[in-house]
Amino acid sequence: MVSFNNTEIAFSSKSKLQLHKAYYLFKLMGHPFLSKMGGKVAELAINLHLPIKGIIKNTVFQQFCGGESIEECSLRIDELAQYQIKTILDYSVEGKASEKDFNRTMKQTLASLDFANKNSNIPFAVFKVTGIARFELLEKVNFGKELTEQEQKEYDRALHRINKICKKASQYKIPVMIDAEESWIQDAIDGIVEDMMREYNKETAIIYNTLQMYRHDRLDYFKKAHKDSKHNGYFIGMKLVRGAYMEKENARAQKMGYPTPIQANKEASDRDYDLALEYACENIHGISICAGTHNEESSQYLIKLMNPVSYTHLTLPTNREV
């Protein structure tokens, strides 16, 4: 059994000052009132043009972000590499909905791939479909509603952006993981990712979908996706996570009067997560996975499953704290 309790290994890339800083930051964030008010105060201060950006950048931003640009991230990437920790560049911009913003996100993702192609310490790229396509448009596609002529053109432009990213990832042979999002746009995202897999995963898994296993239907979807890949002759890549939108999903389901897509309890999420790991290992010659989990039991279970199979087909999380 692998031990995850050695904090000297887990935090070897951190200085004592950084650890103390992180400790007090998380302590403050552990207070719901302070967390809630902190965000509002910070937003107000920014709107009033008060000198708060430096404080944010040296506290919360520094803890969770590598930098504001690829160049700014470079130093941190090199530092982490000294401790055998690899990096994934994620251009995280949400709430933007103009064509200009979508094109900017596409260009940043393409630039990340260009940078990764020259840097072996960046094994993956990642993006969210809502970073390059309008949420409401995806929702309409998700439920099979007819698009207007203008909407169809808009959707075609979004598909062009996605294809451009996936094509470059394929040319560089750098896997790209496409994030999962809310259930009411996920079918649309799944359809797009499946098309990209059929096009670019003919030799190996380059395009990865993301499965949120806190949804009760994702294990079945995983098996259906694998069946399609075998039938159509391509590999599938899956990043397995538990999920990030539980409160939002339950609230919408209750408000709109439909059964929640969320599992009945955490135990069910854990069960399906581990069953997905099991299924991937049983079908390792056609499936590549990234186990995106901070759950120690699931990590130990995957290590146990890996013993009789080839390690080269499995991608474990690179975060040493997992």
Each predicted region: which residue ranges?
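Positively charged, amphipathic and often flexible ligand-engagement surfaces
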Residues: 1-314, 320
